[in-house]
Amino acid sequence: MRTYDFSPLWRSTIGFDRLFDLVETAQRAGEDNYPPYNIERVSEDRYQISLAIAGFSPDEVSVTAEQNAVIVEGNKADKAEREYLYRGISARPFKRQFNLADYVQVQSAAFENGLLKIELIREIPEAMKPRRIAINAAPSGTVHQLEGRAA
């Protein structure tokens, strides 16, 4: 896999740090795909992230909301060593980060049937929402014509 060094670009740009972080994150995206997840659009301003983390308990998983990101970490508690004939359920530690768009916030998280469901909502401030501006017509009969002078 080819890697790129973006440090020369950081020296000459201002305010684009998040853009370069997203590029680096996309570059590392193919490295690990555990745990599997779905991202659903529930309604126009509501989303849900579902992570399949069978074998983990809610105490072994943490969800952290940061600015424009939500981080899910899991670490299985060490228990007595067992002898497995076949081990198909992974219990390895993981860390998964999801980058969020502006104004998207974590509303809640729930653990149900081996799935961690994280509810997201997009709340755009009133000042940022589009609004319709009424167009007033000029009253008729108030048009004044200027007299032209000969040059």
Curated annotation (Swiss-Prot):
A Gene Ontology cellular-component term: cytoplasm
UniProt xrefs under InterPro entries: A-crystallin/Hsp20_dom, ACD_IbpA/B, HSP20-like_chaperone
Domain sHSP: residue ranges: 28-138
Record has Magnesium as a keyword: no
UniProt xrefs under Pfam families: HSP20
Keywords noted in UniProt: Stress response
Domain of life: Bacteria
Positions in coiled-coil regions: none
Entry similarity comment: Belongs to the small heat shock protein (HSP20) family.
Protein name, entry field: Small heat shock protein HspH
UniProt source species: Bradyrhizobium diazoefficiens (strain JCM 10833 / BCRC 13528 / IAM 13628 / NBRC 14792 / USDA 110)
